[in-house]
């Protein structure tokens, strides 16, 4: 069985064609600058890259070129579209309605449109991608895999805000959490690495990248997570502010005369480690500047570390202990110095870092010592494979041939 995984951004599209026998991608690629001049498709097969430069006015045209690339005589990997058993779509927001992945039908599409108000930046391109695929592959089953679904197991006292209850009832204002597909994947992988049943474990998964979030996973279920109603809450991120006093928003608007759009831009695009350091949103640049004595770069790293430690401490308390802490995503998987900074302050949990093993980049490794009371793992996330697994499971459950 071959599953096509599609992840649509506002002007980009990532894809993988995964052979479910080996669970390996047989082709993958990225389309950039959709609807903008200079659009390009980079298609990868067997370690070789092929660039297709063609005007792509919309996502439909982009997906058309992706499908053409997959069957191309020179760099294609399948003979025809019938070889694709199903398409798995990453959808950022599934609201309260979807606690798991779902076969896409007209009712699901209506619900996705309804969730646009909850994810105005992310859900529209997801919907456009689904519609484009439906037009081009009308007989192929489509599955929606939601970033929010894994967090739907949060108890009410963890997802409710202390706001008037009718704001939740009428407008769905509550914590949803994001990066769920990644947290789900690495928590399952951690159980495998530890040789234990996930139902018997208390895990803290740290998805650290330009966007970052933590999740508390107790007995295989997410019981808390750091992002909230939107992906702006929680940790200090690349350009996002994370948790701040909400009254700062009204202060900026009333006292400093910022518009709502300006405040939104500041908090989403100009804050985080970029805003503090004044250098970059890339942790590699900030680490370099800090090593050269830049005080604001060092401050940005300390604020980031402090937030991660606060959440690890809180989630250890929430779960009544922790068996393992997992680092994943761009920074979590690849940054030895960031992991070291965080782990060095977790000695109170009986954690001991193996300095040599912590040098790992992009591979699965236990980076704590043998006698560390709490295990620490670095595990590369694989959201595409998780989407493909969910898609396969749903197609088989619905007996779709």
UniProtKB/Swiss-Prot annotation:
Q: What keywords is this UniProt entry annotated with?
A: ATP-binding, Cytoplasm, Kinase, Magnesium, Metal-binding, Nucleotide-binding, Transferase
- Annotated pathway: Metabolic intermediate biosynthesis; acetyl-CoA biosynthesis; acetyl-CoA from acetate: step 1/2
Cofactor annotation remark: Mg(2+). Can also accept Mn(2+).
Q: Where does ATP bind?
A: 14, 207-211, 282-284, 330-334
Q: Which biological process, per GO, is one annotated for this protein?
A: acetyl-CoA biosynthetic process
Q: Where does Mg(2+) bind?
A: 7, 383
- MF GO annotations: acetate kinase activity; ATP binding; magnesium ion binding
One matching Pfam family is Acetate_kinase
What do the Gene Ontology cellular component annotations say? Answer: cytoplasm
Described purpose of this protein according to its UniProt entry: Catalyzes the formation of acetyl phosphate from acetate and ATP. Can also catalyze the reverse reaction.
Subunit notes for this chain? Homodimer.
Q: Which family does the UniProt entry place this protein in? A: Belongs to the acetokinase family.
- What name has this protein been given in UniProt? Acetate kinase
Q: Which gene encodes it?
A: ackA
């Amino acid at each position: 069985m071959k599953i096509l995984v599609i992840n649509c951004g506002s002007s980009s599209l990532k894809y993988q064609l995964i052979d479910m026998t080996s669970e390996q991608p047989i082709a993958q690629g990225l389309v950039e600058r959709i609807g903008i001049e200079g659009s390009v498709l980079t298609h990868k097969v067997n370690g070789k890259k092929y660039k297709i430069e063609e005007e792509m006015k919309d996502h439909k045209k982009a997906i058309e070129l992706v499908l053409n690339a997959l069957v191309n005589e020179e760099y294609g990997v399948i003979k025809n579209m019938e070889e694709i058993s199903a398409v798995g779509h990453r959808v950022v927001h599934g609201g309260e309605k979807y606690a798991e992945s779902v076969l896409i039908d007209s009712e699901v599409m209506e619900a996705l449109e309804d969730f646009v108000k909850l994810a105005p930046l992310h859900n529209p391109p997801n919907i456009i991608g689904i519609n484009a695929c439906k037009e081009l592959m009308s007989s192929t089953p489509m599955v929606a895999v939601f970033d929010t679904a894994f967090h739907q197991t949060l108890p009410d006292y963890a997802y409710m805000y202390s706001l008037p209850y009718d704001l939740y009832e009428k407008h769905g204002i509550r914590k949803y959490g994001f990066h769920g597909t990644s947290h789900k994947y690495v928590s399952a992988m951690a159980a495998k690495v530890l040789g234990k049943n996930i139902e018997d474990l208390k895990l803290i998964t740290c998805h650290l990248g330009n966007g970052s979030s933590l999740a508390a996973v107790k007995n295989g279920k997410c019981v808390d997570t750091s992002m909230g109603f939107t992906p702006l809450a929680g940790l200090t991120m690349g350009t996002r502010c994370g948790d701040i006093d909400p009254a700062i928003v009204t202060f900026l608007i009333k006292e400093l005369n910022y518009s709502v759009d300006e405040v939104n831009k500041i908090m989403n695009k100009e804050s985080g480690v970029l805003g503090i350091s004044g250098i970059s949103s890339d942790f590699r640049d900030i680490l370099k500047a800090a090593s050269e004595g830049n005080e604001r770069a060092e401050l940005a790293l300390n604020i980031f570390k402090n937030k991660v430690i606060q959440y690890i401490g809180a989630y250890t308390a929430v779960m009544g202990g922790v068996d393992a802490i997992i680092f994943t995503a761009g920074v979590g998987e690849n940054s030895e110095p960031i992991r070291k900074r965080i782990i060095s302050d977790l000695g109170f949990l009986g954690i001991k870092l193996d300095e040599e093993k912590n040098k790992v980049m992009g591979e699965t490794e236990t980076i704590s010592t043998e006698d560390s009371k709490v295990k620490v793992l670095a595990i590369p996330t694989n959201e595409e494979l998780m989407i493909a697994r969910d898609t396969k499971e749903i197609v088989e459950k619905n007996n779709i041939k």
